[in-house]
Amino acid sequence: MKTLGEFIVEKQQDFSHATGELTALLSAIKLGAKIIHRDINKAGLVDILGTSGVSNVQGEVQMKLDLYANEKLKAALKARGEVAGIASEEEDDIVIFEGDRAENAKYVVLMDPLDGSSNIDVNVSVGTIFSIYRRITPIGQPVTEKDFLQPGHRQVAAGYVVYGSSTMLVYTTGCGVHAFTYDPSLGVFCLSHEKVQFPPNGNMYSINEGNYIKFPMGVKKYIKYCQEQDEATQRPYTTRYIGSLVADFHRNLLKGGIYIYPSTASHPSGKLRLLYECNPMAFLAEQAGGKASDGANRILDITPSKLHQRVPFFVGSKSMVEKAESFMAEFPDE
């Protein structure tokens, strides 16, 4: 049984120039995930459920657990000294870590500390998403927003933790996707899925059909396609939508499928955040043989213009994303 720590160190040896800093950074994320896992499991027994009464920069009311997870991850990353600063869905602006170690650190981290946190109250799976970049400003001085506004193809690592019937950490450093299941009796993540690949075709589509009337025509046509009877393509497909990006993505990664959060009449730019949600999931998807786009363009090629930028998101098995894109191209302005 190989642990996450052993696996990371083993892979580090494949790179002669590796310094161990990225390994230490991933270890900090692992620690943060353990703390969040522990406290999610007793969330109903302590006062960390419900809303905080505070709104974030997007105008959304933050859950208590959102803020709690944000603080725990931020503290874990700051303590290691391998991170120059972070950007978080729960922070209005970038957070610059102070001190000589931070100013000399190579990396910045972007994160959604607790995706799907509104599901906690009803005991549904939630997750943590993270994305790691090399800073582009000179070493030895504080980072700036420019270090965070990089296109997704510059990520050096990305991953997520899904807190469900078991807790799993899934990550990539650009050399495939690997998944580790947490053993709470030992306090370690153990390798359970190596070199995970999206099935090339799937029979599940994940979308909130309650918003159907607001969807672009291309999305409506694709949903209709998914629901039609056709033995050759094993249709109709099955709808599976949890309402937590991490949980929906994780299921589709293992079983095959597509996740869609399109633009709508009320959210013409989409609702998911490019930097905290779409880029890391797109990196994972491509490393697992899948595809991710905004319905027309590769997610990882989008150059962000602001921290909390939103985009439409199509991600999953490659053939399914390409079919959805074909409908979007056929009905571009409807």
From Swiss-Prot:
Keywords: Carbohydrate metabolism, Cytoplasm, Hydrolase, Magnesium, Metal-binding. It comes from the Bacteria. It catalyses: beta-D-fructose 1,6-bisphosphate + H2O = beta-D-fructose 6-phosphate + phosphate. Its cofactor is Mg(2+). Pfam families: FBPase (PF00316), FBPase_C (PF18913). It is found in: Cytoplasm. Mg(2+) 2 binds at D112, D115, E277. One of its GO terms (biological process) is fructose 1,6-bisphosphate metabolic process. Pathway: Carbohydrate biosynthesis; gluconeogenesis. One of its GO terms (molecular function) is fructose 1,6-bisphosphate 1-phosphatase activity. Its main location: cytoplasm. Mg(2+) 1 binds at E89, D112, L114. Substrate binds at D115, G116, S117, S118, N208, Y241, K271. One of its GO terms (cellular component) is cytosol. CDD domains: FBPase. Its EC number is 3.1.3.11. Binds 2 magnesium ions per subunit. It is an enzyme of class 3 (hydrolase). HAMAP family: FBPase_class1. Belongs to the FBPase class 1 family. Homotetramer. PANTHER family: FRUCTOSE-1,6-BISPHOSPHATASE-RELATED, SEDOHEPTULOSE-1,7-BISPHOSPHATASE, CHLOROPLASTIC. This is Fructose-1,6-bisphosphatase class 1. The gene is fbp.
